[in-house]
Regions:
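Localized chelating/binding microdomains
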Residues: 38, 67, 97
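Short, conserved catalytic or interaction motifs in soluble domains
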Residues: 54
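Short, charged recognition helix plus adjacent turn
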Residues: 2-8, 16, 79-97
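A short, Lys/Arg-rich alpha-helix, primarily the initiator
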Residues: 2-32
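Short alpha-helical DNA-recognition segment
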Residues: 31-51
Length: 97
């Protein structure tokens, strides 16, 4: 049996929402900290951060931890922000895209 991607465990469409939400949350926090992409990447590349912020790439846990540290927060705080955003997006009365 092949390796399963964690995003394959999500309902159809939610993997894109998770990538997009995580990228948006990271970008929001980076801008709030008044950091450029170059200042926020640590050992990562600016191209990688751009891909993550645009929702095209799901960061690994290690990359998420590095980015969180660069932003002066923790990975769980970032994920909490994404969870809140996703829950409000999928809540009754909110029109899903």
């Amino acid at each position: 049996m092949g390796k399963a991607s964690i995003t394959n465990l999500l309902p159809r469409g939610r993997d894109h929402d998770l990538r997009r939400g995580l990228g948006s949350e990271l970008r929001r926090r980076r801008l709030a900290a008044k950091l450029s992409q170059d200042e926020a990447i640590g050992p990562l590349t600016r191209a990688y951060l751009s891909q993550v912020e645009c929702g095209r790439t799901m960061p690994s846990l290690a990359a998420l931890i590095v980015l969180a540290e660069q932003l002066g927060t923790s990975a769980d705080e970032i994920l909490r922000g994404v969870n809140i955003a996703l829950n409000s997006e999928y809540s009754p009365g909110h029109e899903n895209r």
